[in-house]
Amino acid sequence: MAAEVYFGDLELFEPFDHPEESIPKPVHTRFKDDDGDEEDENGVGDAELRERLRQCEETIEQLRAENQELKRKLNILTRPSGILVNDTKLDGPILQILFMNNAISKQYHQEIEEFVSNLVKRFEEQQKNDVEKTSFNLLPQPSSIVLEEDHKVEESCAIKNNKEAFSVVGSVLYFTNFCLDKLGQPLLNENPQLSEGWEIPKYHQVFSHIVSLEGQEIQVKAKRPKPHCFNCGSEEHQMKDCPMPRNAARISEKRKEYMDACGEANNQNFQQRYHAEEVEERFGRFKPGVISEELQDALGVTDKSLPPFIYRMRQLGYPPGWLKEAELENSGLALYDGKDGTDGETEVGEIQQNKSVTYDLSKLVNYPGFNISTPRGIPDEWRIFGSIPMQACQQKDVFANYLTSNFQAPGVKSGNKRSSSHSSPGSPKKQKNESNSAGSPADMELDSDMEVPHGSQSSESFQFQPPLPPDTPPLPRGTPPPVFTPPLPKGTPPLTPSDSPQTRTASGAVDEDALTLEELEEQQRRIWAALEQAESVNSDSDVPVDTPLTGNSVASSPCPNELDLPVPEGKTSEKQTLDEPEVPEIFTKKSEAGHASSPDSEVTSLCQKEKAELAPVNTEGALLDNGSVVPNCDISNGGSQKLFPADTSPSTATKIHSPIPDMSKFATGITPFEFENMAESTGMYLRIRSLLKNSPRNQQKNKKASE
């Protein structure tokens, strides 16, 4: 491949280089056709001359186009100007390759460049190995490839097609260390991303501000100031780390300036909170069912016609979005606080019922022409819009009745619950209400396993069930009661004749969970004093024969709920006969002996005394139709074994209702607390007990008690 291509002197092309303005216009020779005889004699007509003239003009235009194409190729082949090299043999251009618009040149362009670069590397390696090798200095000679146009193209093709078929798309000058591309590399499928070596350039941003038009000024927002110390003004540390003494006036002034600057930089939205009330005020002018003048203009309707969406609503129904706004949803949470009331209690299945949605009928929207009658003077054009006439089921009052009947309000539901509780004789709710009306003080102390007979009573008197396996060994005779005694039930009357208000307050309506350690200790001392006084008063009394106590039984709690009702002799004898096979022998001996000085007799006497006091007001004791009495006293048999009626079973009895669920429902997955570190915990409580006395909660209690 030759180093240069020689086309001759440039002056040869100058006669063809005329500017467009200086191009002479063809002047047509006008021939006068006055005499037809002269035309025939000369043998040359006007038609032939005009045809020759047209051909000459086409030839001139074609030569000018070829001249411009040759000039462009000559500019491509000329040596680049402005490049100065020290050694033209090594530093000058190695070769120049012209890439034509051919599929082969586009496909193998990268391989051609790699071949040239490999040649340069091979030459450099040879120079390193043999420096003294003679180099060939050839004279410049014309290129072996002649840039000629393909003359096989038909002459009928236009000049424009020839240009497109033989246009140069790339011209690369290869030097030793670099290459110079004058026209650009060819693109693969005209896509620079698919062509190797092509990268989309990334330009640096020169203008950081908006360029304004002539005569206009653009207000540029102030930049947010950098945080700095409000005390000394340094940006290296914050105010909390400032070593300088604090200047309150300067700090306040700088903080205010910083906040103002931040507010201006953020368009007065710096550290502003989002409130729902602002949204309501913002869209407060929009009301459902009310069409404003702007909306009428936007819809293209007047106040003398119904909006088109009204006719569509007749087919789709009431908008579900506004129906959602009218929902009143109950949380379904039930509060078990142990208090006797119907406000925070729920029955079985009541939570699922409360989850049903209710609606506030006052929030139903009025839509004239949909759920209320169309105003007078406004026509109903439902046929034009392809809709349906007003439906009676979509009227507001009919829709409200539908919501009321299918989605009951909370008040109606609670009323139904009360009526159902009163109508069912064996429901737990009815039993609870009866116990509340009777004012039973020990209703909360009943065991959850204790049951009462159902409405269907049997003619037989109650019988004791066989004793359960003992949890703890029975206490021997003469053993004093244990140190820990349960607190008195809620509402238990005082056990001593003393009428002091302190005693009534301690044993009154104070919840045992809210008592402090000192109050519990004081209550324990009062219980012991009451037991000692009962022992001294009833030291000469004998225990009745039919007292339901075993020889080593200990009362777990006082039994104020048992009715002291007279029992016929026949019933008594029958009861004794039924009790003999099942009651242990020690029970008969102990009941006949009647030891008055033992703790069993003391507790029995105390239970009898309280029975006599509470008999007029207690209706909880289950008096059967045949006159037998079902005791409500929680009595232990053999230490911790309860005695229950014989005919008590799940099929014939209902469990006594308690507002607090059974502990077994809360004990799943709970690890029992082992009292290993109780000494440290108790000591810590005793240390901070003085601080707890002055707590706001205790101060409120003392204030209420004093009032």
Swiss-Prot record:
It is found in: Nucleus, Nucleoplasm; Nucleus. Residues 34-43 have a biased composition (Acidic residues). It holds the Pfam family zf-CCHC. The modification Phosphoserine is found at S598, S649, S658, S695. Residues 16-44, 409-518, 531-607, 641-660 are annotated as: Disordered. There is a cross-link at K413 (Glycyl lysine isopeptide (Lys-Gly) (interchain with G-Cter in SUMO2)). Residues 45-80, 516-539 form a coiled coil. The modification N-acetylalanine is found at A2. GO terms for cellular component: catalytic step 2 spliceosome; nuclear body; nucleoplasm; nucleus; TRAMP complex. Its main location: nucleus. Induction: Slight accumulation in cells entering S phase of the cell cycle. It comes from the Eukaryota. Residues 466-496 have a biased composition (Pro residues). Disulfide bonds: none annotated. GO terms for biological process: co-transcriptional lncRNA 3' end processing, cleavage and polyadenylation pathway; mRNA 3'-end processing; mRNA splicing, via spliceosome; RNA processing; snRNA catabolic process. Changing M313E: Reduced interaction with ZCCHC8. Residues 456-465 have a biased composition (Low complexity). Residues 659-707 are annotated as: MTREX binding. The modification Phosphothreonine is found at T342, T472, T479, T485, T492, T577, T648. Residues 549-559, 598-607 have a biased composition (Polar residues). Scaffolding subunit of the trimeric nuclear exosome targeting (NEXT) complex that is involved in the surveillance and turnover of aberrant transcripts and non-coding RNAs. NEXT functions as an RNA exosome cofactor that directs a subset of non-coding short-lived RNAs for exosomal degradation. May be involved in pre-mRNA splicing. It is required for 3'-end maturation of telomerase RNA component (TERC), TERC 3'-end targeting to the nuclear RNA exosome, and for telomerase function. PANTHER family: ZINC FINGER CCHC DOMAIN-CONTAINING PROTEIN 8, ZINC FINGER, CCHC DOMAIN CONTAINING 8. Belongs to the ZCCHC8 family. The C-terminal part (659-707) contributes to MTREX RNA helicase activity, in part, by enhancing its RNA-dependent ATPase activity. Component of a nuclear TRAMP-like complex, an ATP-dependent exosome regulatory complex consisting of a helicase (MTREX), an oligadenylate polymerase (TENT4B or TENT4A), and a substrate specific RNA-binding factor (ZCCHC7 or ZCCHC8). Several TRAMP-like complexes exist with specific compositions and are associated with nuclear, or nucleolar RNA exosomes. Identified in the spliceosome C complex. Component of the nuclear exosome targeting (NEXT) complex composed of MTREX, ZCCHC8, and RBM7 that directs a subset of non-coding short-lived RNAs for exosomal degradation. This is Zinc finger CCHC domain-containing protein 8. It comes from Homo sapiens. The gene is ZCCHC8.
